[in-house]
């Protein structure tokens, strides 16, 4: 499915029901938004590990702007934008304070989202990530260690 967040359309996949039919009052299951690594990857890398939680949570796999099946011009690939995309995504779909999981690059986006929109997340789960990524420093180090070809890849 796709949702319009302004200057991009974000692809997402939902696994698990939002309502728990096994309870008399049809209680809401917690929503877990899963943010993949990259940029350049898509949500499919997370599916084998998280689908098993669909009996207790509603899982929403989200492809970041410019990744997977999401659109988004390269000029808009900014950490602020990726974080704000999550806020617009949640607002558009009526998702209130989800649990947010971020792996690698997705963890950086998740932390930035939580910092910019602190009431927009109930819990934050991080895996194999860093608090910041300095592309300019990475390119400089790649040039020093391996020349132009590795620097172009970075």
Where are these regions (language model features)?
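Conserved alpha/beta-hydrolase "nucleophile elbow" surrounding the catalytic nucleophile
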Residues: 98, 102-104
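Conserved acidic catalytic loop of the alpha/beta-hydrolase fold
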Residues: 80-98
């Amino acid at each position: 499915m796709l949702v319009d967040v302004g200057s991009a359309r974000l692809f997402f996949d939902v696994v698990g029901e939002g309502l728990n039919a096994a309870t008399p009052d049809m209680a809401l299951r917690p929503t877990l938004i899963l943010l993949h690594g990259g940029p350049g990857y898509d949500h499919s890398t997370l599916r084998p590990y998280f689908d098993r939680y669909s009996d207790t949570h509603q899982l929403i796999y989200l492809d970041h702007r410019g990744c997977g099946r999401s659109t988004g011009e390269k000029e808009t690939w900014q950490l602020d934008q990726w974080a704000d995309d999550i806020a617009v995504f949640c607002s558009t779909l009526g998702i209130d304070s989800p649990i947010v999981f971020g792996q690698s690059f997705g963890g950086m986006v998740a932390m930035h989202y939580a910092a910019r929109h602190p009431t927009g997340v109930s819990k934050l789960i991080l895996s194999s990530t860093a608090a910041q990524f300095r592309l300019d420093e990475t390119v400089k180090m790649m040039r020093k260690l391996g020349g132009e070809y590795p620097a172009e890849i970075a």
